[in-house]
Amino acid sequence: VPRQRFTEDALRILRLYRFAARFGFAIDPPTAQAAQELCAHLDCVSVERIEEELAKLLSAPAPAAYLNEKILSVVLPELSPEALAAAKPVVDACPAGAENLPVRLAALLLSLGEDGIRRTLKRLRCSNALIEEAAVLVREARGCDGSFLFGHDSGHSIARPIAFGNRVPPQR
C-alpha cells in the first residue's frame, strides 16, 4: 500500500519523514524502502510543495535522523552525501521551530557557500527574506575561523555560531 500511495503523490514521501521527525516515531522498514525506491518521483512535485515540507521537516525538534540521503539527493541535489553527513549533528544542535528555519537551512547548506545557498533557496522558491537571512548566516559563519567544516568542532568552529544563530550558546 505505501508504494501505491507514494506513486499517487510523491510528496507523501517527504511528509512521511516530516511526521516521523515531528513525532519521533520509527518508520516501518518496508515503508522506508518503498519511499527510497520511489523518491525519484519527487522530481514531478512542484518546488513550492517540496520547500513547504522540507521547511516543516527542518523545524522538527531533532530532524537529522530523518534527513534521508537518497531522498535529499533528489530534493537537494546540490548537497553532497559527505556534506549532509557532516551537517546532520549541526542541524540538530540548532534551535527548533519555524522561527529558526534560516539557522537550520544555513547549517544544512553551509557547504554550498553564500552564493550556492542563495541559488538553492531561490530554486526552491523560498521567500527573499529567508534566502537573505540564511545567506548572511553562512557568510558570517564562514568568516568565524579557517576550519569552517563541521567535523572540526572543537567548540570554536562555525558549528557553534551557526547552531546558536550567532548567539552565545547555553552553558552545559
Q: How would you label these PLM feature ranges?
A:
Residues 1, 5, 43, 49:
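Divalent-cation-assisted or electrostatically stabilized phosphate/pyrophosphate-binding catalytic cores
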Residues 1-31, 37:
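Acidic, glycine- and histidine-enriched catalytic cores of nucleic acid- and nucleotide-handling enzymes
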Residues 6, 25, 40-44, 56-60, ...:
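Hydrophobic alpha-helical scaffolding
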Residues 9, 14-17, 66-70, 138:
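A residue-level signal for conserved active-site and pocket-lining positions in enzyme catalytic cores
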Residues 17-20, 36, 55, 118-125, ...:
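Amphipathic alpha-helical segments within well-ordered protein domains
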Residues 31-38, 53-54, 63-73:
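Hydrophobic alpha-helical interaction segments
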Residues 45-61, 132-140:
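Charged/polar, low-hydrophobicity segments characteristic of intrinsically disordered regions
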Residues 69, 81-172:
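C-terminal subdomains that position terminal phosphate/3'-OH groups for nucleotidyl transfer/ligation
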